[in-house]
Design a protein with these regions (language model features):
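Signature of Asx- and small-polar-rich beta-strand/turn repeats characteristic
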Residues: 1-403
Length: 403
């Protein structure tokens, strides 16, 4: 005799009652003691508890696939990736900082030969937060690198109203965060499509530059020039299928503040940046290759080998890394809502390189020692990583925002 099973019971009480009815109907001679203290009732209730738990987890798993009801951040992030939406991490605050130095007099103005240059990446701090400059600060120029006037010249007078020196103040943009460099030796096992490299920090703000240099025995980090060498550099793109990047040219000025001089370049060495569910930054490199060494083993015409290589080597998603190289990743960490600090807070100089090329070494050192800094404006724009509700709304309205 076929047995009818009711599949609509989902909670403990319903499953328990269904099991009792099932036993009464099909096994009345084997078991008929439904007292709460009986062994048979214990077995029935154990099965009812298992059924209740299975129903609960089935509902929870289905709930995590629905954008309106998902509770786990990993589930919402997974749906965001499915829809091609990149969820950002923490945001860094920005502010304006006044860098001041004292330079000697020359005639009726200051001696420009003692005007220093502060290299990019100068670090200042206050309230436990560190900020960095993104460009060189040239005190001999009245303009920023972008051509915006930003220098103030203040004469310093003695008791007889004679000018004894000048204070030069340059107003520059500083961004919260600290630059770090991570290195990794590329081995043969790393030469594979879509290699993933996860950075060790969970508060990565941005990737400054990525280069792969020949050799595996580096004892020092590359210089700024090495990091921006176009032959060794790997470029960040929105998607691996994007093969054209814009490279700014800081040596040229624009008469329009909304236009940045530069050039577009087609590149094969590219990567994308994503964030894991735990907030760590992950770099994913390309999946193609330009290696035709396997074809060269055959005794065929060299030009024919190259033509065959053009067909079988697909670089549409970028190149894979090459072995026996060292990968250097320059990136910035920091950010968060607590980096929004008040004015006149950034008064400490942490790490700064000041170049003064005046004729007198003692005066050069005096100029270097005179560097001071403060922020006349509060730091704004810092934000924590998006919450689950923020990500949910970003995913929900992602398609409508593209119309």
């Amino acid at each position: 005799m076929s047995k009818k099973i009711n599949y609509f019971s989902r909670n403990f009480a319903d499953v328990r009652q269904e099991l009792i009815s099932f036993v009464k109907q099909y096994y009345p001679a084997i078991f008929n003691d439904f007292n709460d203290a009986s062994v048979g009732m214990m077995l029935l209730e154990l099965n009812a508890a298992v059924g209740d738990m299975l129903s609960f987890h089935t509902d929870r798993m289905f709930q995590e696939t629905q954008i309106d009801f998902a509770q786990e951040k990993s589930s919402v992030l997974s749906m965001a990736r499915t829809f091609g939406l990149k969820i950002p991490g923490k945001r860094a605050s920005v502010t304006i900082a006044d860098f001041s130095v004292v330079v000697p007099v020359l005639g009726d103005t200051f001696d420009v030969s003692y005007a220093p240059i502060v290299t990019r990446g100068a670090q200042i701090s206050g309230a436990g937060k560190v900020f960095e400059t993104s460009e060189d600060i040239d005190f001999s120029s009245p303009f920023t690198v972008g051509g915006v006037p930003n220098r103030l010249v203040i004469p310093n007078l003695d008791n007889n109203n004679n000018i004894i020196n000048y204070t030069l103040t340059k107003r520059e943009l500083v961004i919260n965060g600290v630059t770090k460099i991570q290195s990794r030796i590329v081995t043969d096992s790393d030469v594979k499509p879509f290699l993933e490299v996860i950075l060790p920090d969970d508060n990565v703000l941005s990737i400054n530059s990525v280069v792969a240099l020949e050799g595996t025995d580096f004892t020092t980090n590359p210089s700024n020039a090495d990091f921006f060498n176009e032959d060794d550099r790997w470029y960040e793109v929105e998607a691996l299928a994007d093969d054209i990047v814009f490279i700014p040219d800081n040596t040229k000025l624009s008469d329009n503040a909304t236009i940045k001089p530069g050039k577009f370049k087609r590149v094969n060495q590219r990567f994308i940046k994503e964030f894991t569910d735990n907030g760590f930054c992950k770099l994913i490199f390309g999946g193609g290759t330009e290696d035709i060494s396997s074809l060269c083993d055959f005794d065929v015409n060299k030009s024919l080998v190259n033509r065959i290589g053009d067909f079988i080597n697909n670089n549409s998603l970028g190149l894979t890394l090459s072995p026996n190289k060292t990968l250097f990743i320059s990136y910035r960490v920091g950010g968060g809502a607590d980096t929004n600090i008040g004015p006149n807070t950034l008064t400490s100089i942490n790490n700064i390189i000041v170049n003064v090329n005046g004729p007198n070494a003692t005066t050069n050192q005096q100029v270097i020692n005179s560097v001071t800094v403060t922020n006349p404006l509060p730091a704004l724009g810092g934000k924590n990583e998006p919450s689950v509700e923020e990500i949910r709304n970003l995913v929900r309205y992602n398609f409508s925002s593209q119309e």
